[in-house]
């Protein structure tokens, strides 16, 4: 019997796959537990439509990420910070991913989620710093920061 998997089933198939499985297994286990449904021509058509919509949505997200990368790669896109600095040359406050995200939004109107900004630890030094940003699984950019003494 041909079934369309509605969820990942270990050893049998992944969500969205169409596979041939034994009839008893399909009727008594997969279909009863809503892990799969019978692959009729109508359900196959629905699946193809959903997959096309998903691909289109992913393409839009990728295009948006590439547009943000283009803005971040420009030389004039340099996020400015003014921080108080102690005698040892380190800032009193630290610059976190949240602060970077907020300043990027305020100064350039570019929205980047703070969770996408890759910071090992908050920045406490002054000068020019480049911070990597993972905009999409295929798109990575750099945010240029200029941290000056206030």
From Swiss-Prot:
One of its GO terms (biological process) is translation. Binds to the 23S rRNA. GO terms for cellular component: ribonucleoprotein complex; ribosome. PROSITE patterns: RIBOSOMAL_L9. It comes from Streptococcus pyogenes serotype M2 (strain MGAS10270). InterPro entries: Ribosomal_bL9 (IPR000244), Ribosomal_bL9/RNase_H1_N (IPR009027), Ribosomal_bL9_bac/chp (IPR020594), Ribosomal_bL9_C (IPR020069), Ribosomal_bL9_C_sf (IPR036791), Ribosomal_bL9_N (IPR020070), Ribosomal_bL9_N_sf (IPR036935). This is Large ribosomal subunit protein bL9. Keywords: Ribonucleoprotein, Ribosomal protein, RNA-binding, rRNA-binding. NCBIfam families: L9. Belongs to the bacterial ribosomal protein bL9 family. HAMAP family: Ribosomal_bL9. The keyword RNA-binding applies. It holds the Pfam family Ribosomal_L9_C. Signal peptide: none annotated. PANTHER family: 50S RIBOSOMAL PROTEIN L9. GO terms for molecular function: rRNA binding; structural constituent of ribosome. The keyword Transferase does not apply. Gene3D superfamilies: Ribosomal protein L9, C-terminal domain, Ribosomal protein L9, N-terminal domain.
């Amino acid at each position: 019997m041909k079934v369309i998997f509605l969820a990942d089933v270990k050893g049998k198939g992944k969500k969205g796959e169409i596979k041939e499985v034994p009839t008893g297994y399909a009727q008594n286990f997969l279909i009863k537990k809503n892990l799969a449904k019978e692959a009729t021509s109508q359900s196959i058509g629905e699946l193809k439509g959903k997959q096309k919509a998903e691909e289109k949505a992913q393409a839009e997200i990728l295009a948006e990420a590439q547009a943000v990368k283009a803005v971040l790669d420009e030389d004039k896109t340099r996020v400015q910070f003014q921080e108080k600095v102690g005698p040892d040359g380190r800032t009193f406050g630290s610059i976190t991913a949240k602060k970077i995200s907020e300043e990027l939004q305020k100064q350039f109107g570019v929205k980047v989620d703070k969770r996408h900004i890759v910071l090992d630890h908050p920045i406490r030094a002054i000068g020019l710093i480049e911070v990597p940003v993972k905009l999409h699984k295929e798109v990575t950019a750099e945010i240029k920061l200029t941290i000056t003494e206030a």
